[in-house]
Amino acid sequence: MADLAVPLTFTDAAANKVKTLISEEENTELKLRVYITGGGCSGFQYGFTFDEKTNDGDLIVENSGVKLVVDPMSLQYLVGGTVDYTEGLEGSRFIVNNPNASTTCGCGSSFSI
């Protein structure tokens, strides 16, 4: 049986930051959840939250012992994308590099398909 490709990449930088945040919270059950909501200046926006549970149908991507969780509705907009963590002049944040987005806003937090 062939291995199935993971439809979303969870970078080492993002996983390491999640690991640090989980350690600070002292709750090993936490997982980073990425989701899509309507809104933002381009129609859809990315959201990130910590969640202790997973739901039926959630995709779980593991890296360095930490988990990224995505619900099925959000996943359809994120397939082929990458969840990363960056630190720069604008501050530090989790970002999504999404090949499905036809346009993105200047700050990168919203997009359209």
Curated annotation (Swiss-Prot):
Family matches, as InterPro entries: FeS_biogenesis, FeS_cluster_insertion, FeS_cluster_insertion_CS, FeS_cluster_insertion_RrpA, HesB-like_dom_sf
Pfam families: Fe-S_biosyn
Cofactor(s) of this protein: iron-sulfur cluster
Any one GO biological process: iron-sulfur cluster assembly
Alphabetical UniProt keywords: Iron, Iron-sulfur, Metal-binding
Molecular function GO labels: 2 iron, 2 sulfur cluster binding; 4 iron, 4 sulfur cluster binding; iron ion binding
Entry keyword annotation includes Mitochondrion: no
Superkingdom, natural source: Bacteria
HAMAP family in alphabetical order: Fe_S_insert_ErpA
Subunit (UniProt): Homodimer.
Protein family (similarity comment): Belongs to the HesB/IscA family.
UniProt-recorded name of the protein: Iron-sulfur cluster insertion protein ErpA
Gene: erpA
